[in-house]
Amino acid sequence: MDSENRPFLKEDGSILTRPAGHGALIYNLNAMEEELVSIKNIDNVCVERMQPTTYHWKKVLMGRALQLRDRIRGYIFALDQISSAGNELNRLSGAQFITFNVQEDPYATEECQALCNEIESFLREELCIEMPEAKSCRERAEMLRKKLDRPVRVCGMVKNEGEPGGGPFIIREKDGSTSLQILEGAQIDKNNPDAVAALKSATHFNPVDLVCCLLDHKGEKFNLLEHVDEETGLISSKSYKGRELKALELPGLWNGSMSDWNTLFVEVPVETFNPVKIVLDLLRPAHQ
């Protein structure tokens, strides 16, 4: 669109089209068969002497992602055992089986409620997810399972030293729950003083250092396109042959395109972040 919000026309009268931003990469990621995928900005490079630190922390992120994935899978398996109750329901707890009476609602048992309590505590303490209140024991278990059954990502975060880009935030979702999200400055409501204050006081910065687990508890691929927030997007200011324009872009890859993922933020040393945005960045110690 032009500055008057009219379709931007080229010299020949055709409408100008342009790339939809890095959010389009979710289609590439969705086509991958690998279980574990590492994502890093292409301009985040360093000289050989600094590579060991980067490699070490990449392994830390991968290990943490697998640890988180395995714990989530364990909870899903436990909930599925309860939901598949027939004449008799057995759930393995440690080395013992717990047997539920045929007359008993498996979702209302002390064992199921204890499991739900444990899952809610895990979501709250590990992933900063506060769950909305459920209307019944069954709904509670189903809501928890749905929240668990999502792709997993672990995102490295460095201390904020004034670099341009997004950062880690806790937001309130439409269903009443909270979640961890990476937000760009353009996504912050500048008319909301609390939101602006949160942005200015941010202690950490997103260097784009992610590890993603793409398989579900059955070892099958998630359809990542089902976990994209289609209602989000970015309007960026660009130019074409000296003419200003407004470009609508897809939800950013690590923003709206991954908004419905189970997310964990891990602080990593600033030494792992060595961007080259402009030529003068090559004068930094990390590039000498």
Regions found by a protein language model. Give the residues of each.
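Conserved catalytic alpha/beta cores of large enzymes that bind or transform nucleotide phosphates
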Residues: 43-48, 58-86, 90-120, 199-288
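Domain-scale recognition of functional cores that engage charged ligands
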Residues: 1-161, 175-181, 187
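Short acidic, glycine/serine/threonine-rich loops at helix termini
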Residues: 1-4, 48-53, 166-170, 222-223, ...
